[in-house]
Amino acid sequence: MKKIILLLATTLISTAHIHAQKLTVHTIGDSTMADYVENTTRTRGWGEMLQEFFTSDVRIINYARGGRSSRSFTEEGLWDKVKSNLNPGDYVFIQFAHNDEKEQGKDGADGRGTAPWTTYKTFLEQYVDETEALGANPVFITPIVRRYFTKAGTISPKGCHDIGI
């Protein structure tokens, strides 16, 4: 009987500990999501403001960096930093495409451009697979369109990375 009570108490304490933990959201992406130093620029990435929409029970960690693509975020080691901080149950918000369109949407020499249906897709799959392998939850965020317009004033897509997902 003592063993059953001990097992039950251990289970309840473990469960209470799990529910007491904060929910953590890690954001990865480019300048449209990145943090900026206040008072030095009027620019703000949406990831910088995300915490304002949640209670203190949710913690936002923004890893997004200006100029990064799905390729450069990995190749510069930023993704490794995120993975080292992931815990089971965490969320990873993934938004790339803005800089993946560099080099006319091809695998570029600058280390940023990716082809929409090959390398771009491969990097996105990597983020999903590695996030899930660590017990976390990947969430794709629709890329923000670039400010390219036709003469008629409609949005003119320069790449296909928004549909490459």
Question: Predicted regions span which residues?
Answer:
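Alpha-helical cap/lid subdomain in secreted, periplasmic
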Residues: 77-165
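Acidic/histidine-rich helix-loop elements
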Residues: 34-44, 64-73, 106-116
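Solvent-exposed, charged interface segments at domain starts and junctions
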Residues: 8, 21-24, 107-109, 117
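Active-site-proximal beta-strand/loop segments in catalytic clefts of secreted hydrolases
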Residues: 28-32, 62-68, 94-99, 141-145
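Active-site-proximal flexible loops/turns
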Residues: 9, 37, 71, 102-104, ...
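Bacterial Sec-dependent N-terminal signal peptides
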Residues: 1-21
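Serine-esterase "nucleophile elbow" of acetyl-processing enzymes
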Residues: 20-64, 80-88, 92
